[in-house]
């Protein structure tokens, strides 16, 4: 669960929509730090081999399938998602990456 501007957003719901987008192999959604909203929806996306994805294309897909406030505010395209030995995505590592990239006040 992430809270953006006082609204509860379930990452799994956003992930399920993004996984139906053409060219998406894997996706993981986490909350990224935001000074105004507290957290914003950030999607880490792995493209299928040979597929080119764009934030605009994924955004258009999300707008058709979920409420606007739930769509990711940022897309990060990666070659692979960090996983543990059992194949579970390590969302903690993704959040740490976002916190390391965010400017400090």
List PLM regions with ranges.
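Acidic/polar alpha-helix N-cap and adjacent early helical turns
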Residues: 96-105
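AMP-binding/adenylate-forming catalytic core of the ANL superfamily
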Residues: 1-70, 79-96
């Amino acid at each position: 669960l992430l809270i953006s501007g006082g609204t509860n957003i379930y990452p799994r719901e956003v992930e399920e929509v993004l996984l139906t987008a053409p060219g998406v192999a894997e996706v993981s959604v986490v909350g990224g730090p935001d000074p105004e909203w507290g957290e914003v929806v950030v999607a880490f996306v792995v493209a299928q081999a040979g597929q080119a994805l764009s934030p605009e294309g994924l955004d258009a897909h999300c707008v058709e399938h979920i409420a606007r406030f739930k769509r990711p505010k940022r897309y990060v395209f990666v070659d692979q998602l960090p996983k543990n030995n059992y194949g579970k995505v390590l969302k903690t590592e993704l959040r740490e990456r976002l916190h390391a990239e965010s400017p400090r006040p």
